[in-house]
């Protein structure tokens, strides 16, 4: 019965959205908040359909960006480092810091963290976790700034609201831009920051329209199409 109830709410909420229209970023954010059916502080997520062919190496898009107002989620950070770098990570506020001790824990099924950072000299060991961390999107990567000796900067940025983005096989990128409790202006600014970042990393080999379609939605709400020109 719960599903039917939720379905009814969703249908009512969806009626408020004109599926044929492309709303301005501000209007879209207002609609997303209005059509949110969740009883919790739902995440607001932006979805970009890009004119790229991810099968081609020169059209893969991956990186990270610090959102000006964060995501509303407190990220738990695990840092693989030793010696002075381990001390730096602890001082920066990392939740877990270690070298090989956490590798065994993870292999046994421990995942009480959201982001993994590793110093380059630890990647030989951390690489053993590729099969476990890779499918969960948790493997440290230089492109997202999570393989670095500057652990202080890495931890600070993650805690400040850094989000990773990666194009999937169909050419889509999904990124959280905050919570429904955020002020409209803050959600719009986060949204525009992501859009601007994706424009800057447009592959030179990408042909035709780059941002084909952009939508925004809350966790359990309907998608709202956005006029790309209002994200500039």
UniProtKB/Swiss-Prot annotation:
GO cellular component: large ribosomal subunit
Gene3D superfamilies, sorted: 3.30.190.20, 3.40.50.790
Keywords, in A-Z order: Repressor, Ribonucleoprotein, Ribosomal protein, RNA-binding, rRNA-binding, Translation regulation, tRNA-binding
InterPro entries: Ribosom_uL1_bac-type, Ribosomal_uL1, Ribosomal_uL1-like, Ribosomal_uL1/biogenesis, Ribosomal_uL1_3-a/b-sand, Ribosomal_uL1_CS
Quaternary context: Part of the 50S ribosomal subunit.
Functional note: Binds directly to 23S rRNA. The L1 stalk is quite mobile in the ribosome, and is involved in E site tRNA release.
Family: Belongs to the universal ribosomal protein uL1 family.
NCBIfam families, per the entry: rplA_bact
Protein name: Large ribosomal subunit protein uL1
Organism from which the protein derives: Bacillus cereus (strain ATCC 14579 / DSM 31 / CCUG 7414 / JCM 2152 / NBRC 15305 / NCIMB 9373 / NCTC 2599 / NRRL B-3711)
């Amino acid at each position: 019965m719960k599903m039917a109830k939720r379905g009814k709410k969703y249908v009512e909420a969806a009626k408020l959205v004109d599926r044929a229209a492309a709303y301005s970023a501000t209007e879209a954010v207002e609609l997303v908040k209005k059509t949110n059916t969740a009883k919790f502080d739902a995440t607001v997520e932006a979805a970009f359909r890009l004119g790229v062919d991810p099968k081609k190496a020169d059209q893969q898009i991956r990186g990270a960006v610090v959102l000006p107002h964060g995501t509303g989620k407190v990220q738990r950070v695990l840092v693989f480092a030793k010696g002075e770098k381990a001390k730096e990570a602890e001082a920066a506020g990392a939740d877990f810091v270690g070298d090989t001790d956490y590798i065994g824990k993870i292999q046994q099924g421990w995942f009480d963290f959201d982001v993994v950072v590793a110093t380059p000299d630890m990647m030989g060991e951390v690489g053993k976790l590729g099969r476990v961390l890779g499918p969960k999107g948790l493997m440290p990567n230089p492109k997202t700034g999570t393989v670095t000796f500057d652990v202080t900067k890495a931890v600070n940025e993650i805690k400040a609201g850094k989000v990773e983005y990666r194009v999937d096989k169909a050419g889509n990128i999904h990124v959280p831009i905050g919570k429904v409790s955020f002020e409209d202006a803050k959600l719009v600014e986060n949204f525009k920051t992501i859009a601007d970042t994706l424009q800057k990393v447009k592959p030179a080999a990408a042909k035709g329209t780059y941002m084909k379609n952009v939508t925004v939605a809350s966790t359990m709400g309907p998608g709202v199409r956005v006029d790309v020109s209002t994200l500039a």
